[in-house]
């Protein structure tokens, strides 16, 4: 009887932990409101888009894919799945929110505050803006 009780408690504990992880991973990633006030010092800088593309192709495509659709070769094994940078959900975020996410990260994505300097992170933001989905109404 004691073995059965211990087994039930152990299974219940594992189920609880798995459900907690699942809930966290399905929670939308929202930057704090303060991130919306961060201004992009490179907004409109065409050269920064090219620089961001080089960084993106070296560091981001493995998860986010070459077109930013979240379909890189590593994406299948990740939970939560990588963001689709062409999506309306990403594109409607402020530059500051995207910059904050690049800086801080959230598992499985690392934060890049130490990998990229501030200018490089803004270059990535500008390149991600260039990835927006084509307008289908035209």
For the regions a protein language model found, what residue spans apply to each?
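Short, non-ligating residues that shape and space the ligands of small metal-coordination modules
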Residues: 69-70, 118
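Bacterial N-terminal signal peptides
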Residues: 9-19
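Signal peptide cleavage region of secreted peptide precursors
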Residues: 20-25
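Sequence/structural segment immediately N-terminal to covalent heme-attachment motifs in c-type
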Residues: 46-69, 75, 98-104
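Electrostatic cytochrome c docking/interface patches
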Residues: 26-55
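Short, flexible, mixed-charge acidic loops at enzyme active sites
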Residues: 28-30, 73-78
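Bacterial N-terminal signal peptides that target proteins for export
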Residues: 1-11
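Extracytoplasmic electron-transfer domains, predominantly the class I c-type cytochrome c fold
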Residues: 79-131
């Amino acid at each position: 009887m004691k073995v059965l009780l211990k087994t039930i408690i152990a299974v219940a504990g594992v189920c609880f932990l798995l459900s907690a992880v699942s809930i966290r991973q399905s929670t939308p990633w929202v930057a704090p409101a303060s991130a919306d006030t961060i201004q992009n010092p490179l907004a409109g800088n065409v050269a920064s888009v090219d620089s961001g593309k080089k960084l993106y192709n070296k560091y981001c495509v493995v998860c986010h894919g070459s077109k930013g659709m979240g379909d890189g070769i590593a994406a299948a094994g990740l939970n939560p799945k990588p963001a689709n940078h062409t999506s309306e959900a990403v594109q409607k975020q402020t530059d500051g929110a995207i910059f904050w996410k690049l800086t801080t990260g959230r598992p499985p994505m690392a934060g890049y505050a130490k990998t990229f300097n501030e200018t490089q992170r803004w270059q990535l933001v500008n390149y991600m803006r260039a990835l927006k989905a084509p307008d289908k109404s035209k």
